[in-house]
Amino acid sequence: MPRDIPVGNGRLLVTFDHKYQIRDLYFPHVGQENHAGAGPCRFGVHSDLPGKGGKQLLSWTQDAAWTIHQRYLRDTLTSSVTLDHPDLKLAMYCNDCVDFHRPIMIRKIKIKNLADHDRVVKVFHHQDFNMFGTKIGDTAYYDPELRGLVHYRAKRYVMVTFFQSGEQRIDEYATGTSGFHGAEGTWRDAEDGHLQGNAIAQGAVDSTIAHHVNVPAGEEKTIYMAIIAGHSREELLELQKWLTKMQPQGVIDRTGAYWRLWVGGTNINFGNLPPKVVELFKRSLLVLRTQIDNGGAIIAANDSDIMQFSRDTYSYMWPRDGALVADSLDLAGFPDVARNFYTFCQRVITKDGYFYHKYNPDGSPASSWHPWVIKNERAMPIQEDETALVVWAMWRHYFRYRDIEFVRPLWVDVVQPAAEFMCRYRDIRTGLPLPSYDLWEERWGVHAFTVATVYGGLKAARNFAVCFGDREKAEKYNQAAEEIKAGAAKYLFSDKLDRFVRRLVPKDSPVPPDDHEYRERENLVADEEIEDIYEVDETIDASLYSVFKFHLFEADDPRVISTMKQVEEKLWVKTRVGGVARYENDYYHRISNDIAAVPGNPWFICTLWLADYFITRAKTPADLKLALPIFEWTAGHALESGVLAEQVNPYTNEPISVSPLTWSHATVVSTAIKYLEKLESLQLCNTCNQPIFRMRRQGPVEVKSQATFDRFEAEFEITDSREVFSAVGQFVKNDPRSGQKFQAALAIDTRDCIGCEVCVAHCHRDVLKMVDGKALIDLRNLNACDMDGECVEVCPTDVVSLIIRPAEDSTPPEMPKPLLNTK
């Protein structure tokens, strides 16, 4: 079941399912210690049923009668949830957020009475908490000093309470046994609209609280619910004191302002990316931040429902996922978050220079299914691409930010040990890496993806060595990389298939017996073929994009072109949903056995890899547009909230597996940035050959001089209503030069507008303004247009049009097509 809404701050993460029930509550680490994983925390209301003779009803939001829409407030990590119950004649509008600094979640509940009489509405919330992730030895009790219901065990405390009109209070409560000896929980106690008031329970426990609200006919009332997490009762008291002073609405206001500032801080010009894609880009950045622990661990996903399939979760740090996510954050302009991840890697890398399968957020090795013995010989239980990608990402970070003081210890503690490991963990017969597990964590062998990433990692290590003046290591790492490239060209490309193969599986198990001894191998003799020592896995796999992604071979190489053409043709899902599958006959969460039409479920990352390929090969802005339908496909298949799952149902588009998947959102970010950077390199002025489009806008508070710095005063943002801006405007005006009356139509094709601001700069009447990175018409000032057409002449991408006719001509000016009205 997907998590439609995650909200968090790096210490406290709370997730909601499609029925608007809390399903996960992680504290104090994101992804570790899920205190709400036992079952749904129900949310509901109790009131009379209008027209039913005084009959009463309690309805939880999981009931089918509710219509629920879950979104976020724009550019924030504050939810925007609407709930409607036609039988109860009640509607609710809710906002949820976690304070950007403190472990406090606030829910604002606005209740509207749609009946024609005054009513008492009881709001119920059920807590099915299990401290430390297990229902053993917990206590739930009502605390009169805290005026809340507290669950605790050892150094984990969670309190729930209500606020209304500045007053904190709970009107009813109950604690009891849950999930033991057939006890379903205290939510059953609420079904008659009353709670028994049991003040304490111990063992396998749950609780329910209620707040009574008097709502006049046709009016609405607002209350708040707060969830506070801490390490002790004393800490809860301090946080309660702070919240009482700040008030819940203050938390919502300050948290919304923080995340708007955070996501907008890079001042990116989104060029001609469609508005829905821009919105998904920003949402992806915000969702990414919810999945990252403040200690540096980037968690793959926090959706505990996956436990029903394997009794384990995705709530771990995979170095591969983490490296790719950190790289996307570096690209987007968030190096501080990425640095925390690189420092985490510095703490956990083994002394022999490789990373284990995955890690817990606290840095300890996590559960694994990779064996230490294969074919009766000791094996490395690793995915070598994870080691390579960390080094690859670190180099890209340094190259972009040049923070030499930061990377100096990483060069010593991470890059060198990892590079030495990658150099020696190779089959001397082929030059290729020795076997390990693949990125899909399913198969053992020598994988094209791993080969490409190890090549990229060694090239990155070579660059570090050059920067640090170590000629010997630079030559060593480069030589190993070139040997890998030669081996890939010789052994991984199939002339028969005219493409790269997925993997090689050794017949004689060339696996090192331990971490230090690597057995010597003789080179292949003249008449020996690769098939004599390796079995070739010819399966077409979307991860073959790696051969150009990590520059093992360039995207214009005929071998790469042929490979990617076959990936697109054979792995595109041939249903109305579309998208790219991982590989042919993918079994993971399989929906269809029609392999010809549905080779596997469509994955967001695999589909975006195809866009990456189109972007890499683009030579003109027109070539670049081949990627736009894939961006639009991604945005169109997200949940209503903008959350992306790992994969979707090929027939219904329902999310499958975990949701959100951090890697999915990171791939949106990195691919979009790559698109914009490529657009900047292609959209050049014909006169000066300089970029017309620039991805990075000038910051609104950029300091240009000491005088500017001294005079600057921050102000609260004043946002014009978007209703006054449009891509199309028509008006009638007298031409002062001729005295004649004209009809005019001004239009902007926002799909191709790259946000260069040239037309806005030449509009001296304030008719054109920049809104969300696009030039739009301010309808309030439209009649001020002097109709001289300068905005049309200066537009470098020909997206501005102005059509003028004499007013006596009854035919209205024809608007250029197609147009996207972003009003």
Model-assigned labels for residue ranges:
Residues 1-5, 233-235, 248-317, 340, ...:
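Low-complexity, Ser/Thr/Pro/Gly-enriched N-terminal "stalk/linker" regions
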Residues 1-86, 159-188, 254-280:
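An extended acidic
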Residues 70, 119, 213-234:
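Short Pro-Gly-centered flexible turn/kink motifs
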Residues 70-75, 82, 297-307, 317, ...:
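Helix-terminus loop motifs that line ligand-binding clefts
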Residues 758-774, 790-807:
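Iron-sulfur cluster-binding cysteine motifs and their immediate structural context
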